[in-house]
């Protein structure tokens, strides 16, 4: 295989990268995903969210080492397995970070991460109906507040207000603190995972190839330049080459694992 870009991991980041890179029709992109397809009613259906979260087909089921401060208990570390990654198994809660958090990141040295820098990207990715000037309306990820018809919904918010907390009309605008309705990345009754919002449209263009069940062993180098990856599908080993870049987007646990197997970082 020879491609311009190889994206290792078809999760939340990998789906977006494949979409954006694939906007150039002259570029060929390979996406390698260790899990399978996200096309399943239990992934699509918001009310079934606990099923993929607790199914090894969709969740790697990782755990921490025993924690001394928790009486030796192991902590679950949910990691999405399959196209869309953790966006295919999470709770679909659409809540931006507080603007002051981003300002603090900038103050601590994370150049380019202040609120005014990240806001355009929040706006670019979302499609909100009836939102304010801080919201996006034409993005690929559909956002809504649900039906909100259960009387307990309003009772819970009213109880918070009665206890002295502010009422927030929308926690993704200026009033973050307090009680209010929560938005969800759900469109037409279906989970808006990164695979649905970004990868599927990219695949339809014809210049993005996706291989599922592809377990990447290591990155291949020519000197200090990454030139490809060594991976296996159904225990059959294969190699893929990239003329421009190899992108690791396999998550916070598996990306460094692949790097270590590739001879980068501290010895295992």
Protein language model features and the residues they cover:
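Structural detector for helix-capping/boundary residues
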Residues: 10, 15, 116, 197, ...
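Glycine-rich loop(s) and the adjacent beta-strand/alpha-helix scaffold that form part
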Residues: 24-28, 35-40, 219, 229-268
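Short, hydrophobic alpha-helix immediately C-terminal to the catalytic nucleophile
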Residues: 15-19, 196, 256, 260
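N-terminal glycine-rich phosphate/pyrophosphate-binding loop and immediately adjacent elements
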Residues: 1-123
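Conserved redox-cofactor binding core of oxidoreductases
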Residues: 39, 107-226, 232
């Amino acid at each position: 295989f020879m491609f311009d870009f190889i994206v290792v991991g078809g999760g939340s980041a990998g789906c977006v990268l494949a979409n954006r890179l694939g906007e150039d029709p002259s570029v060929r992109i390979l996406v390698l995903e260790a899990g399978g397809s996200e096309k399943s009613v239990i992934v699509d259906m918001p009310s079934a969210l606990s099923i993929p979260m607790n199914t090894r087909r969709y969740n790697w089921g990782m755990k921490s080492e025993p924690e001394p401060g928790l009486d030796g208990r192991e902590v679950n570390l949910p990691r999405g397995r399959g196209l869309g990654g953790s966006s295919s198994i999470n709770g679909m809660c659409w809540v931006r970070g507080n603007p002051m958090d981003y300002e603090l990141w900038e103050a601590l040295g994370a150049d380019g991460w202040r609120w005014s820098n990240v806001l355009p990207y929040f706006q670019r990715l979302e499609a909100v109906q009836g939102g304010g000037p801080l919201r996006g309306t034409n993005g690929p990820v559909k956002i809504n507040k649900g039906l909100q018809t259960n009387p307990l919904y309003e009772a819970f918010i009213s109880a918070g207000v009665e206890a002295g907390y502010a009422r927030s009309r929308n926690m993704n605008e200026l009033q973050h603190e307090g009680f209010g309705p929560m938005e969800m990345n759900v469109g037409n009754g279906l989970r808006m995972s990164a695979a649905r919002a970004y990868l599927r449209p990219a695949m339809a263009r014809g210049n993005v190839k996706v291989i599922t069940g592809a377990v990447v062993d290591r990155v291949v180098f020519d000197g200090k330049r990454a030139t490809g990856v060594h991976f296996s599908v159904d225990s059959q080993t294969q190699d893929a080459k990239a003329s421009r870049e190899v992108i690791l987007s396999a998550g916070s646990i598996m990306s460094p694992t692949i790097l270590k197997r590739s001879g980068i970082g501290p010895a295992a």
